[in-house]
């Protein structure tokens, strides 16, 4: 992820009228959405009209998953009560208006955060007014089977990961004791940081 591009830019891409989101996240989502994902989604929806729609992602994928869920919900492409969003290490995507719009559209939305993962705290809320949508599930531990967690239904709760100051990028690399950073181990010859 081009972290400087992400954290140093105000949310400028318009979403749903008055809401603003980070252009880097929006462009990444929109590139995939308009390159065939939307058509594939609609085809699968028509073949399976009774299914729920589960959308998930980690890091940039979490931001894109949030935008996908909000896009599908706001354009009424799927019943709202059947949209389920679960992300891992999702960064802040947009402004308060986006967070409120997201909250009003998607009732089943959970941002899972591992211990001191730094990336859910980027871009900082005090820069350009970025704000998370709800709800947060915070594991202030190693995320082993049976480990305790705290659920916070507010958008930016001091009872969850906002209460910690010892942020660490290493906690972003594994969730539930599974290594999720593919660039180190997966996709031989693929460089996710290359344009």
What are these regions (language model features)?
Residues 1-56, 74-82, 106-107, 194:
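A conserved cap/lid and substrate-binding interface adjacent to the catalytic center
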Residues 13-26, 128-195:
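C-terminal His-loop and adjacent cap/lid subdomain of alpha/beta-hydrolase
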Residues 55-58, 87:
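Short glycine-centered, acidic/aromatic-flanked micro-motifs in structured strand/loop junctions
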Residues 57-61, 65:
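Gly/Ala-rich beta-loop-alpha elbow adjacent to hydrolase catalytic centers
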Residues 64-67, 123:
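Generic hydrophobic alpha-helical membrane-span motif
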Residues 66-74:
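Short glycine-enriched nucleophile-adjacent loop
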Residues 77-157:
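The feature captures the conserved acid-bearing segment of alpha/beta-hydrolase catalytic domains
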């Amino acid at each position: 992820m081009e972290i400087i591009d992400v954290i140093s830019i105000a949310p400028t891409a318009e979403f749903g009228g008055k809401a603003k989101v980070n252009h880097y996240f929006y462009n990444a989502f929109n590139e995939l959405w308009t390159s065939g994902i939307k058509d594939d989604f609609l085809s699968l929806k028509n073949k399976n009209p009774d299914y729920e729609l589960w959308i998930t992602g980690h890091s940039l994928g979490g931001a894109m998953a949030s935008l996908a869920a909000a896009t599908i919900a706001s354009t009424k492409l799927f019943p709202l009560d059947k949209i389920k969003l679960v992300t891992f290490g999702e960064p802040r995507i947009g402004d308060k208006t986006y967070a409120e719009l997201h909250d009003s559209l998607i009732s089943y939305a959970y941002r899972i955060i591992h211990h001191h993962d730094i990336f859910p705290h980027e871009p900082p809320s005090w820069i350009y007014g970025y704000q998370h949508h709800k709800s947060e599930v915070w594991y202030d531990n190693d995320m082993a089977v049976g480990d305790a967690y705290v659920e916070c239904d507010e958008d930016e709760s001091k009872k969850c990961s906002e209460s910690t100051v010892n942020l660490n990028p290493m906690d972003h690399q594994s969730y539930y004791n599974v290594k999720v950073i593919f660039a180190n181990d997966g996709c031989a010859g693929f460089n996710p940081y290359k344009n």
